[in-house]
């Protein structure tokens, strides 16, 4: 079994990337503390960070943009989740130049162990045979009328072991 929370952001212009005060190899922050830093009512984990000795650091691995400004760039291509200046969700493999061309306002990225796209242009995708097992999950989507859907599923807990991609 699993449990999670779904946040519906009716105004996509309110969606933004929140970050630690400084990207360092020191310890990172938990989502709740980053949300407090921005007076946000909610948030989900995003991006990928350098793995420290005992915890993840506050140093992102790939592209991070906020308000159109590049805050971090590894110089390569990575899987990006972003929102454009006209509030459209963008998911794809790209570098900073492509993100700028697509008019991305805010984005985070992760390396290629991203999960599959579950729905594309309203059509459910075939995810049979995609590995990943039962784990904590975060998913993002956008409805046809522009609302942003943020789903966080708890995992590795007695009351919520996590979800598979098919569960999502």
Segments (PLM) and residue ranges:
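A substrate-binding/cap region within the structured catalytic cores of diverse enzymes
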Residues: 74-127
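Short, solvent-exposed aromatic-acidic interface loops
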Residues: 21-27, 94-100, 153-157
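Zymogen propeptides
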Residues: 1-75, 79-80, 88-91
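Domain-core and long-helix interface of multi-subunit machines
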Residues: 111-115, 119-168
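A short, polar/proline- and glycine-enriched secondary-structure boundary/capping micro-motif
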Residues: 27-29, 100-106, 159-166
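Short acidic/polar alpha-helix capping motifs at helix-coil junctions
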Residues: 12, 102, 133-136
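Solvent-exposed coil/turn segments that connect beta secondary-structure elements
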Residues: 12, 48-49, 86, 96, ...
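Extracellular/periplasmic catalytic domains that process cell-envelope and extracellular macromolecules
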Residues: 35-37, 74-75, 84, 131-134, ...
